[in-house]
Amino acid sequence: MANKKRAMSFSEKHQQLVDENFRKSLHVQVLNKLERQAKNQVVQNENDERVERQRFLRVLQNEQFELDMEEAVQKAEENKRMRDRQLEQEERLANELARLKHESLKDEKMRQQVRENSIELRELEQKLKAAYMNKERAAQIVEKDVIKYEQMKRDAEIERIMMEEHKRLLKEENVKQEKRDKERAQYYVDLEKQLEDQERRKQEAYEQLLKEKLMIDEIVRKIYEEDQLERQQKLEKRNAIQKYIKEFQRAQDLWRQKKREEMEEENRKILEFAKIQEQREGERMARVQESEEKRVQRQNLLIQKLEETLRQRDDLERVRQELYLEEYAEFIKLKMKEEVEQRLRKQRDRKQDFKDQMALREVLLQAAKEEEEAFKKAMLAKFAEDDRIELMNAQKQRMKQLEHKRAVEKLIEERRNQFLADKQRELEELQLQQRRQGCINEIIEEERLRLLKEHASKLLGYLPKGVFKKEDDVDMLGEEFRKAYQKKSEVCEEKGSS
């Protein structure tokens, strides 16, 4: 009975050990699954945050583009209003300059009006504003490139971390697998030891049974010797004892056979369980490998789609900026062409007015000369008619004619002087107007050079064509600026030729 109890206790311990190993395996699988789900959730959250940030940048870029277009339309309308105001202010400037008597006040007023209303200075300011706009756009492009590089860098870092984490998990899984293999091998060793112990205990039990049998034989012999007389009476008792011994031996054999069958069945179940566990572990590793390959494929596909989207968006943004710059440059060019044509037309009109004035002067001089001759003849005739009666002799007639001639010449001289004074006044007014225009041109040139000195060095590489009217403008800004500007121009020419 004690052997049977010990065998049952060993079976229960073995079953508990198997159950505990199975629970540990399930617990490890659950922990691995939870860890993978947490990592997948972190990656998904980072991807959602990156997509949301890209969407926000896209909205900001669209709003900036709409603001730029609206600003361009407003600038066009403002330029039109400025041209209208400029024409009105030029008329007011001419009237104001005619009224002003103090030269310093007049010069200051002229400078102020010229700075406010000069088309050339307005064009230069618009070009400088366009250069600042180009510089700002270039800075935005550089900033977007930096953001894109940082994003790619972060993606690469995430990929590296995920690969390292994957390698770490594989390494941990290999360590756990090795540990499980060692535990399984140790379990087999312990099982062999237990089988050996069971066999040893069986042998000891058999030897004990033999000893008990010898003891029983000895007891029977003694009983036979001591109670020879009562043999017949005790024969039945002895037969009963022998029967009991036989039954005990038969029961012992049956118990041994049953325990051997139970041990064989238990060993078979252990081997089957180990085989099933090994098969499950192989299937789990295959599923993990397949899931990892699918995850890497999805991640690579997502990265490719993201790169393609970023590239298409950058191409679209670059095309939009190029179109906007081309349209704005065409608008500035057309406006400059209109202003140049308007200035040339005004210059031609002024030249034509001057020619007309000179021709009119010649006509007036000729008419005045003819008028003088007619007036002279009329006055001589009138004086002659008035004094004809009073003349007494030829001497008085000659003296009277000379007197009339001197009076007529005096009147003619007075008319000529008046005419010359009027023409001189007109010439002085024309010269004054020319001096005013020259002063305005000087003020415009000074303001143009001032704007270039103030802004050109800050906008090197972003200045549009037409900002510098001559090479002296570049030299005026210094040797360092001239070299940098020349180098920038050579780089632009090389890009254009390539």
Swiss-Prot record:
Annotated keywords: Cell projection, Cilium, Coiled coil, Cytoplasm, Cytoskeleton, Flagellum, Meiosis, Nucleus, Phosphoprotein
The keyword Coiled coil belongs to this UniProt entry's keyword annotation: yes
PTM sites of type Phosphotyrosine: 188
GO molecular function: identical protein binding
Coiled coil (residue ranges): 29-253, 287-360, 390-437
Keyword Coiled coil: yes
Compartments where found: Nucleus; Cytoplasm, Cytoskeleton, Cilium axoneme; Cytoplasm, Cytoskeleton, Flagellum axoneme
GO annotation, biological process: cilium organization; flagellated sperm motility; left/right axis specification; meiotic cell cycle; positive regulation of cilium assembly; sperm axoneme assembly; spermatogenesis
Region spans: Interaction with BBOF1: 1-314
Pfam family, one: TPH
GO cellular component: axonemal A tubule inner sheath; axonemal microtubule; axoneme; ciliary basal body; cytosol; intermediate filament; motile cilium; nuclear envelope
Entries under PANTHER family matching the protein: MEIOSIS-SPECIFIC NUCLEAR STRUCTURAL PROTEIN 1 (PTHR19265:SF0)
Protein's job: Microtubule inner protein (MIP) part of the dynein-decorated doublet microtubules (DMTs) in cilia axoneme, which is required for motile cilia beating. May play a role in the control of meiotic division and germ cell differentiation through regulation of pairing and recombination during meiosis. Required for sperm flagella assembly. May play a role in the assembly and function of the outer dynein arm-docking complex (ODA-DC). ODA-DC mediates outer dynein arms (ODA) binding onto the axonemal doublet microtubules.
Subunit structure: Able to form oligomers. Microtubule inner protein component of sperm flagellar doublet microtubules. Interacts with ODAD1. Interacts with BBOF1.
Entry's family note: Belongs to the MNS1 family.
Name of the protein: Meiosis-specific nuclear structural protein 1
Organism, scientific name: Rattus norvegicus
